[in-house]
């Protein structure tokens, strides 16, 4: 301890110092505590919710094809100091100072994005600032279309995505269909494969300026070459949305859209296993040569970059871009390629296991990471089966199948293999998952016979109440949790 004489000497000297020099800390201890303590100390309520979600993920079988478990290294960047900086603009062209390091991170992310997909930087560029997939598609459309121009994309009930311009007979569901004229193409309902012949006939009449090749619930490889040939005949752009399959494309375990596309968009958190973000890849160089020999260049880089910022977004999320750079580096590792190979092989095995249980699959199988189960032959729907699965800690999602008329009770169940392959599942594990799904379907059929109500919403509410109280559902839940909790999640080992 300081002697009283020394303490008096220190106080006397401090009186001669300016106010800022007499303070021990730049902020008070209480203010310092507010910004330095853990979430457990600052907000126990939110910390408890976080722990609940961690436990749910650990104790659940995650089959939703658009979900995955990202790596600890990616998570480290998502919660890092990179999120503190504001950086409107692009590397070397920011509207704020102090972005020298941020520029390095974004430039590295762009470089790795091209490397991850084997792209020549003289022929392709990439914007890594879009916040998610649907906005990325809007930015890309806006760069090459005027309001009222025409788009063709896969119909949502046939496996497409909302952001491809979905509308019904009475309602423009996606605002894309308000900004632009949209016309869907569909599957052949007998085969479950895209009906390319009808697509070509309709496109010749509709004359779209953009054809979208991509899906959210289509399990087969898309014929990009044929769609490219069609787009050339129409003078249209081919925009490929590979959000679901980008991880597979990076690992070269499925066909790549890049050789045939003008623009490629993707999310970054699905099979790619990165943070929640998006990218827009765009062609450079010469787009076409006229009959008189005049070269017409692509102008996509300038237009797309402008439509991202300042056209639609302000400051980018630097923590996400930095985390994405890490994920893209991981894409080039041999273990990542092996993982994607297992995602596809597991999906094929899972599909076979479901067929062996008597399930009908749309297109009779899969080439990718996802499977679409048609439940009509079991006289049950995806909504009720999803409800039983959810209460048994199995996450899957109801989905429309070709021919569906009810949005509340679609006939399909969409499942996939990326997340559980990350946790170490192989063929034997997916055999067991198929057994769990079969049990859940049988339970759903029994509960449906007991439900009460006059209108669809009442019937579904009654069904869910029965599922909450069902001893069979509780027993299935117990089996699932006991089994799946033994498999680690990233960062646990």
Swiss-Prot record:
Catalytic activity: (6R)-5,10-methylene-5,6,7,8-tetrahydrofolate + glycine + H2O = (6S)-5,6,7,8-tetrahydrofolate + L-serine
UniProt KW Transit peptide keyword: yes
Co-factor(s): pyridoxal 5'-phosphate
N6-(pyridoxal phosphate)lysine PTM sites in chain numbering: 270
Cellular localisation: Mitochondrion
GO biological process: glycine biosynthetic process from serine; tetrahydrofolate interconversion
Disulfide pairings: none
Additional remarks: In eukaryotes there are two forms of the enzymes: a cytosolic one and a mitochondrial one.
Protein name: Serine hydroxymethyltransferase, mitochondrial
Organism: Candida albicans (Yeast)
Gene of this entry: SHM1
């Amino acid at each position: 301890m300081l002697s009283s004489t020394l303490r008096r000497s220190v106080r006397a000297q401090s009186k001669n110092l300016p106010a800022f020099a007499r303070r021990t800390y730049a902020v008070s201890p209480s203010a310092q505590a507010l910004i330095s303590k853990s979430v457990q100390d600052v907000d126990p309520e939110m910390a408890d919710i976080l722990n609940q979600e961690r436990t749910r993920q650990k104790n659940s079988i995650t089959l939703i094809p658009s979900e995955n478990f990202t790596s600890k290294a990616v998570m480290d960047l998502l919660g890092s100091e990179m999120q503190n900086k504001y950086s409107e603009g692009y590397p070397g062209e920011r509207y704020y100072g102090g972005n020298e390091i941020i520029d390095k991170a974004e430039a590295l992310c762009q470089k790795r994005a091209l490397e991850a997909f084997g792209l020549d930087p003289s022929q392709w560029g990439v914007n890594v600032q879009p916040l998610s997939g649907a906005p990325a598609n809007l930015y890309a459309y806006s760069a090459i279309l005027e309001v009222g121009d025409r788009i063709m994309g896969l119909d949502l009930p046939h496996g497409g995505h909302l952001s491809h311009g979905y509308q019904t007979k009475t309602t423009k569901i996606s605002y894309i269909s308000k900004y632009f004229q949209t016309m869907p193409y569909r599957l052949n309902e007998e085969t479950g494969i895209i009906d390319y012949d009808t697509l070509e006939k309709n496109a010749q009449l509709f004359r779209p300026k953009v054809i979208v090749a991509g899906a959210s619930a289509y399990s087969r490889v898309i014929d990009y070459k044929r769609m490219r040939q069609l787009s050339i005949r129409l003078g249209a752009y081919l925009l490929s949305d590979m959000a679901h399959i980008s991880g597979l494309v990076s690992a070269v375990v499925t066909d790549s859209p890049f050789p045939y596309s003008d623009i490629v968009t993707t999310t970054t958190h699905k099979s790619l296993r990165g943070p929640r973000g998006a990218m827009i890849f765009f062609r450079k160089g010469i787009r076409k040569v006229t009959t008189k020999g005049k070269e017409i260049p692509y102008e996509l880089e300038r237009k797309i970059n402008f439509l991202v910022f300042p056209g639609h977004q302000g400051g980018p999320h630097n923590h996400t871009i930095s985390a994405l750079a890490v994920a893209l580096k991981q894409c080039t590792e041999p273990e990542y390629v092996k993982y994607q190979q297992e995602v596809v092989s597991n999906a094929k095995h899972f599909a076979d296991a479901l067929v062996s249980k008597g399930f009908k699959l749309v297109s009779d199988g899969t080439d990718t990471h996802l499977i679409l189960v048609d439940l009509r032959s079991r006289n049950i729907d995806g909504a009720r089966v999803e409800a039983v699965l959810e209460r048994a800690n199995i996450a899957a999602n109801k989905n429309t199948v070709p021919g569906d008329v009810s949005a509340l009770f679609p006939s399909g169940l969409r499942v996939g293999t990326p997340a559980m392959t990350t946790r170490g599942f192989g063929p034997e594990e997916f055999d067991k998952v198929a057994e769990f799904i079969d049990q859940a379907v049988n339970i759903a059929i029994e509960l449906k016979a007991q439900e009460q109500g006059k209108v669809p919403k009442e019937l579904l509410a009654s069904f869910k109440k029965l599922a909450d109280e069902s001893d069979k559902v509780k027993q299935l839940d117990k089996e699932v949790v006991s089994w799946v909790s033994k498999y680690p999640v990233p960062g646990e080992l």
